[in-house]
Amino acid sequence: IARPRGIINGVDMLYSGEVRKVRADAINRRLNDGELVLVAPLGYSATGEIFNLTHEEVATDVAISIEANKLIYLGEESGLKDKKGALIKELTTSFIKKQLINSINEPAQKRIWRNLIKASENGVDRIHLVDRKINGGILLELFTHEGIGTMLSRDPLEKIRAATLEDIGGILS
């Protein structure tokens, strides 16, 4: 379900909309039946108007609503790169909020990162950014140790801590 964006800075956004509500029950019912669910970036208002939605917002809100563990975002690039051009493999939400979001100048990129932060802060454990132009990119990201994109999570994935008695079985095996 969608609502109109309205007038922003004196510009009528016409048929551009925002996600108002996701019917998670309907999506989960289909997923539980073993079906693949494709969600288009279109939304309908309560009065039947059709609105164009951003795919980032739709993906984020659907992932949050269905309590997804992962969100995979296929974009124009394979993730975030450092100043030398090397791919950054892992980032935390807090790092992005403190260090990165204010340095992004391009509105589309800022919108993407704001949506990814929103997903992370609302229960999506891992968000992967993968280059849509790489053949087999999703498989390479998910099923190789290094992956090919950038992964965002609330907390660092690798935490160093002292071993406990419960860890002995895993250490010895």
Where are these regions (language model features)?
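C-terminal catalytic "cap/lid" subdomain
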Residues: I1-L172
